[in-house]
Curated annotation (Swiss-Prot):
One of its GO terms (molecular function) is acireductone synthase activity. Binds 1 Mg(2+) ion per subunit. The lineage of its organism: Eukaryota, Fungi, Dikarya, Ascomycota, Saccharomycotina. Bifunctional enzyme that catalyzes the enolization of 2,3-diketo-5-methylthiopentyl-1-phosphate (DK-MTP-1-P) into the intermediate 2-hydroxy-3-keto-5-methylthiopentenyl-1-phosphate (HK-MTPenyl-1-P), which is then dephosphorylated to form the acireductone 1,2-dihydroxy-3-keto-5-methylthiopentene (DHK-MTPene). Coiled coil: none annotated. Substrate binds at residues 112-113, 151. Mg(2+) binds at residues 9, 11, 176. Belongs to the HAD-like hydrolase superfamily. MasA/MtnC family. It comes from Lachancea thermotolerans (strain ATCC 56472 / CBS 6340 / NRRL Y-8284) (Yeast). Its EC number is 3.1.3.77. The gene is UTR4. Pathway: Amino-acid biosynthesis; L-methionine biosynthesis via salvage pathway; L-methionine from S-methyl-5-thio-alpha-D-ribose 1-phosphate: step 3/6; Amino-acid biosynthesis; L-methionine biosynthesis via salvage pathway; L-methionine from S-methyl-5-thio-alpha-D-ribose 1-phosphate: step 4/6. This is Enolase-phosphatase E1. Its cofactor is Mg(2+).
């Protein structure tokens, strides 16, 4: 399989699918009331965009339903930044993914529903035996739903390919979500299904070119 760039999903692909829902979401939810009473201008600007009376309740509802809301994603990034910086959060990136990102012969890009800010934080504070590891120097660029669109729409992948200056058929996209892979494939991108512990079983997984370890790439 020849490709000129790799586009990676995060949750369920380079780190356990449980990390977001069992670590990041609970950390954020504990800060919702404090967030809603914040006098920070950036936070206030984001909160007013919800245009609802019960902002805290609305935020909790979005998180509970795992809605990919762009305003929510930005707020989460702001809250998680504090958690990463004070050592409460470390990202459990798979060892084989760390090795692949550090040693890839082609540019590595990230595409996640989480904000670009949250993505950079995750890769800046990767859990390692020596406290934390910063993978940002090895990642060429980041894309999210604000910059590129929803991950289940083919137009999003066309935008990314255009942005990186590589034809879609020269990009390999790896994700645990078959709907995302279907969307990417429409543009001509090469695709692989990430099969990791805890991921949902995918029907007809073989047709999605499954990979269980990035050492096999």
């Amino acid at each position: 399989m020849a490709y000129a760039a790799v586009l990676l999903d995060i949750e369920g692909t380079v780190c356990p699918i449980s990390f977001v829902k069992e670590s990041l979401f609970p950390f954020f939810l504990k800060q919702v009331d404090t967030l809603c009473s914040s006098q920070d201008l950036q936070v206030q600007r984001l909160l007013t965009q919800f245009q609802v009376d019960d902002v805290a309740g609305h935020i909790r509802s979005l998180v509970a339903r795992d809605v990919k809301d762009p305003i929510l994603k930005q707020l989460q990034g702001l809250v998680w930044e504090n958690g990463y910086k004070d050592g409460q959060i470390k990202a459990p990136v798979y060892d084989d993914a760390i090795k692949f990102i550090k040693n890839s012969d082609v540019p590595v890009y990230i595409y996640s529903s989480g904000s670009v800010k949250a993505q950079k934080l995750l890769f800046q504070y990767v859990e390692s035996r020596s406290n934390t590891l910063d993978l940002r120097p090895f990642i060429k660029g980041y894309f999210d739903i604000n910059t590129s669109g929803v991950k289940t729409q083919s137009e999003s992948y066309a935008r990314i390919a255009n942005n990186v200056g590589i034809k879609p058929n020269g990009v390999l996209f790896i994700s645990d979500n078959p709907f995302e892979l279907d969307a990417a494939k429409i543009t001509g991108m090469q695709t692989m299904l990430a099969v990791r512990p805890g991921n949902s079983e995918v029907r007809d997984a073989l047709k999605y070119n499954p990979v269980t370890n990035f050492d096999d790439l």
